């Protein structure tokens, strides 16, 4: 089991947005991975993007450029 660390977790309204995020990140070489939404977060769909906190600015720019709507950005232990 992985050691829990403080991460940036991007929650989405829809699964389609989560999948679009994964595709955009892979195309742009942005780190991160899809995870089940942590229990501490309530989100519209069951998937979230997990990435290091240091990537917040890059993630926000990618969301804007790709036209992906995030429900919220959270900092939580994952």
Set out the residue ranges of the language-model regions.
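Short amphipathic alpha-helix segments
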Residues: 13-31
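A short linear hydrophobic-aromatic micro-motif
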Residues: 31-37, 71-72
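A generic "binding-loop/recognition-motif" signal
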Residues: 15, 37, 55
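A short acidic, helix-capping loop that chelates divalent metal ions and anchors anionic groups
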Residues: 41-45
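Short glycine-/aliphatic-rich beta-strand segments at the starts of folded cytosolic domains
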Residues: 4-11
């Amino acid at each position: 089991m992985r050691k829990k660390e403080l991460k940036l977790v991007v929650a989405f309204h829809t699964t389609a947005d989560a999948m679009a995020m994964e595709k955009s990140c892979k195309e742009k070489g942005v780190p991160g991975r899809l995870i089940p939404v942590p229990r501490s977060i309530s989100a519209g769909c069951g998937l979230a993007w997990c990435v290091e906190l240091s990537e917040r600015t890059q993630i926000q720019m990618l969301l804007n450029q790709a036209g992906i709507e995030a429900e919220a950005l959270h900092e939580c232990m994952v």
